[in-house]
Amino acid sequence: MITVALAKGALLRESVERFQAAGLDFSAVLDPDNRQLMVPSTCGRARALLVRNGDVPVYVAYGQAQLGIVGYDVLREHQMPVAHLVDLGFGGCRMSVAVKNTSGYTRATDLPPHCRVASKFTRCARQYFDSIDLPVELVHLTGSVELGPITGIAEAIVDLVATGRTLRDNGLVAIEDLFHTTARLVGHPLALRLDQGELQSIIDVMQRSPHDAVGVN
């Protein structure tokens, strides 16, 4: 039986639609009354694990799921040994450095050395600031990172930015982009090597335009 890891949250609906196009229907996870974390497909030949975003590559890396869909930002941050298979193109946003709009900073190199930077993505932030040779103190937060500059716990933040509305509503502005992120299909390397074609048929469908995809049998 094929097991796939699906992330709760913003990527879930489109992830379910992509697997539906490949012949695996996990639409039951979209039911607001659903409380199951392991959901079988309607065809009975696969199941989905409904997990937190950051846990998708963990389940795939340890072989509890053969496939998963997760944001590139999570893959960059966690760096788990999974196979990067397809850039699915949805869920696009930017990993950015942001500051108070009254700070006067216009680029990351304007920040003072050894200032505090708040982020949920401390590995990505560290790699970026190391690349521009700017020493900073990273403050790990798990939510509402925008409060960092507002409360004074940090001079800047590194976080995902889609429309920028949340930043604007909190008096912040993005001054530098680290990278662009989209949803990616990932796989367990050994499972892919041992695959008898079933996983590859799903991957092949995922590689097509979602408008052209036809479910596999």
Curated annotation (Swiss-Prot):
Reactions it catalyzes: 1-(5-phospho-beta-D-ribosyl)-ATP + diphosphate = 5-phospho-alpha-D-ribose 1-diphosphate + ATP
What's one Pfam family the UniProt record gives for this protein? HisG
Checking Gene3D superfamilies in the record gives: Periplasmic binding protein-like II (3.40.190.10)
Classification via InterPro entries: ATP_PRibTrfase_cat, ATP_PRibTrfase_CS, ATP_PRibTrfase_HisG, ATP_PRibTrfase_HisG_short
Main location as per UniProt: cytoplasm
Q: Which GO terms describe its cellular component?
A: cytoplasm
Tell me one GO molecular function of this protein: ATP phosphoribosyltransferase activity
Query: Could you say which EC number(s) this protein's record lists?
Result: 2.4.2.17
Q: In which pathway does it act?
A: Amino-acid biosynthesis; L-histidine biosynthesis; L-histidine from 5-phospho-alpha-D-ribose 1-diphosphate: step 1/9
Q: Name one GO biological process term.
A: L-histidine biosynthetic process
Q: Which superkingdom does the taxonomy of this entry point to?
A: Bacteria
HAMAP family per the record? HisG_Short
PANTHER family from the UniProt entry: ATP PHOSPHORIBOSYLTRANSFERASE, ATP PHOSPHORIBOSYLTRANSFERASE ATP-PRTASE
Q: State the function annotated in the UniProt record.
A: Catalyzes the condensation of ATP and 5-phosphoribose 1-diphosphate to form N'-(5'-phosphoribosyl)-ATP (PR-ATP). Has a crucial role in the pathway because the rate of histidine biosynthesis seems to be controlled primarily by regulation of HisG enzymatic activity.
Free-text note regarding domains: Lacks the C-terminal regulatory region which is replaced by HisZ.
Family statement: Belongs to the ATP phosphoribosyltransferase family. Short subfamily.
Record-given protein name: ATP phosphoribosyltransferase
| Species name | Synechococcus sp. (strain WH7803)
According to the entry, what is the taxonomic lineage of the organism? Bacteria, Bacillati, Cyanobacteriota, Cyanophyceae, Synechococcales
Gene name? hisG
